[in-house]
UniProtKB/Swiss-Prot annotation:
This is Cytokinin dehydrogenase 3. Disruption phenotype: Increased leaf erectness, asymmetric growth and development of lamina joint. Coiled coil: none annotated. Plants over-expressing CKX3 exhibit decreased leaf erectness. FAD binds at residues 87, 89, 91, 93, 97, 155, 160, 166, 170, 221, 471, 509. InterPro entries: Cytok_DH_C_sf (IPR016170), Cytokinin_DH_FAD/cytokin-bd (IPR015345), FAD-bd_PCMH (IPR016166), FAD-bd_PCMH-like_sf (IPR036318), FAD-bd_PCMH_sub1 (IPR016167), FAD-bd_PCMH_sub2 (IPR016169), FAD-linked_Oxase-like_C (IPR016164), FAD-linked_Oxidoreductases_BP (IPR050432). It catalyses: N(6)-dimethylallyladenine + A + H2O = 3-methyl-2-butenal + adenine + AH2. Monomer. Belongs to the oxygen-dependent FAD-linked oxidoreductase family. Its cofactor is FAD. PROSITE patterns: FAD_PCMH. It comes from Oryza sativa subsp. japonica.
Length: 527
């Protein structure tokens, strides 16, 4: 065993030296004992955004957290080179955040996929211990067999546990239960130093809080303990249409003020026939809404609130009556409220149907120049105006989500960045501009760059004028990241110095470019 470990260490040192060399030695699969290091793949250099393509020098397919630990321990201790490491989950990033140019990509899906469930376990709560490379859809499928499910979700479930927890993880349940990072009891993390640490709010809390929403900068999540609740059997799914933005947001804020009755709240802008049709694919009932969208020079814009009420099939609660009580307080367009009952699984997995429709049309694997932002409620109307000035409603392809979140459901000890709050502004909005750009429809490289430029200008204006912050942020320079973090930068940088002082992890974010020229460690120029 000791001989094998020595051989592994020697071979890994050879790998590091080859990576630091100006020549490329990794041209064929290599087996370094327990470390399965492979040459780069197309998958490792691409993501859902299809905007950036940065090829690594090698791919690690770990069989256990110890493999990741061994790799990072060597890189952290090595005085040579500037090799970086990125953890890749489902590859759903937009701007190459999980890529590592000339570095090493860790394929998290290679980790063991066991899920352990505990009903009414420690602390009198139910939870699941799940690997960081497992997708949320897998956790849902297994937990439902026990009548349980996580409380907080993302809209799309084919994302990894570790990936969403490294950002925040939001959806229509966030107003009620907080983001996914507020529903974690414990983590197993491999730090940038190569240490395997089990952390929680009461044990190694600084690492626990750093990693949650930490953009992969402090450690790689290899296991998480996710809080569970009783799963409903059915969901009453409701949509209501509006022709006035102020009324739309007023009703959204009304709904999130009723967490006892309402379980999910989102909303979206209806710009044109295409957006109305695509948003209706997963909604399994007839929507008899045929609005006048005006003309190109004088467009008419509509809005849709989507909310849901869980149905536990309890005879003491009539879900139809609950929806009636809620809807009577709303001010939607008369006769344009629609509802349908679906299974809990189908409701949570609703985006999958839209995905399959796009795949069948050849429109899934196209460019996705998305922009996601958190906007203070006081500025949401002004943001809407900025947004409409930056797009053409008649030819916009994609979805624009707008829905409210409640600040007190977020733990500010984590690394996530929220807009600074006023004394009374406890509501903020999640806005997702989820557009597609299809080269086959004429959106060439120039077209894509123009869309990205528009988004940068919109994000910049919203940040400087409204105090908005990017979610799933992309900033091309470290200076841009400093502005993004604002007063939170010092804490973020201190955490980097503590847990990943050589700046090995998360190179695709571009927050801490690794500098091999400093003998005191790569972090010296950022502290």
């Amino acid at each position: 065993m000791e001989v094998a470990m020595v051989c592994t260490r020697v071979n890994l040192l050879i790998l590091i030296l080859s990576l630091c060399s100006p020549y490329k030695f990794i041209q064929s699969p290599m087996d370094f004992g327990p470390l399965n290091l492979l040459p780069t793949t197309t998958t490792a250099s691409s993501d859902f955004g299809r905007i950036l393509f940065h090829s690594p020098s090698a791919v690690l397919k770990p069989q256990a957290p110890r493999d990741i630990s061994l790799l990072l321990s060597f890189l952290s201790a090595s005085p040579l080179g500037k090799v970086t490491v990125a953890a890749r989950g489902a590859g759903h990033s937009i701007h190459g955040q999980a890529q590592a140019l000339d570095g090493i990509v860790v394929e998290m899906s290679s980790l063991p996929s066991e899920i352990e469930f505990y009903r009414r376990g420690e602390g009198d709560v139910s939870y699941a211990d799940v690997g960081g490379g497992i997708m949320w859809i897998e956790l849902l499928e297994q937990s439902l067999k026990l009548g349980l499910a996580p409380r907080s979700w993302t809209d799309y479930l084919y994302l990894t546990i570790g990936g969403t927890l490294s950002n925040a993880g939001i959806s229509g349940q966030t107003f009620k239960h907080g983001p996914q990072i507020s529903n974690v009891l414990q983590l197993e993390v491999v730090t940038g130093r190569g240490e395997i640490v089990t952390c929680s709010p009461t044990k190694d809390a600084e690492l626990f809080n750093a990693v949650l929403g930490g953009l992969g900068q402090f450690g790689i999540i290899t296991r998480a303990r996710i809080l569970l609740q009783e799963a409903p059997q059915k969901v009453k799914w409701v949509r209501a249409f509006y022709d006035d933005f102020a009324t739309f947001t007023k009703d959204q804020e009304l709904l999130v003020s009723m967490p006892v009755l309402v379980d999910y709240v989102e909303g979206f802008i209806v710009l044109n026939e295409q957006s109305l049709h695509s948003s209706s694919i997963a909604f399994p009932t007839n929507v008899d809404f045929n609005p006048d969208f005006g003309t190109k020079n004088n467009p008419k814009i509509y809005y849709c609130i989507e909310f849901a009420v869980h149905d536990y099939q309890n005879k003491n609660i009539n879900v139809e009556q609950v929806v009636e009580v809620i809807s009577r307080q709303m001010s939607h367009i008369a006769s344009h409220l629609y509802s349908v009952e679906v299974s809990y699984f189908d409701f949570l997995n609703r985006v999958r149907m839209e995905e399959m429709s796009l795949r069948n049309s050849g429109l899934w694997e196209v460019h996705h120049p998305w922009l996601n932002m958190f906007v203070p409620s006081a500025g949401i109307s002004d943001f809407r105006d900025l947004l409409m000035d930056s797009i053409s409603p008649d030819n916009f392809e994609g979805l624009i989500l707008i829905y409210p979140l409640l600040r007190h459901k977020w733990d500010t000890n984590t690394s996530v960045v929220l807009p600074d709050s006023g004394s009374t502004d406890q509501v903020m909005y999640a806005v997702g501009i989820l557009r597609s750009a299809n080269p086959d429809d004429g959106c060439s490289h120039h077209c894509l760059q123009e869309l990205l430029l528009r988004h940068r200008r919109l994000a910049g204006a919203a940040a400087s004028g409204l105090g908005a912050k990017q979610y799933l942020a992309h900033h091309p320079t470290p200076a841009g990241w400093r502005r993004h973090f604002g007063r939170r930068w010092e804490r973020f940088a201190d955490r980097k110095a503590r847990f990943d002082p050589r700046c090995i992890l998360g190179p695709g974010q571009g927050i801490f470019p690794r500098d091999s020229s400093s003998s005191n460690g790569a972090f010296a120029s950022y502290s």
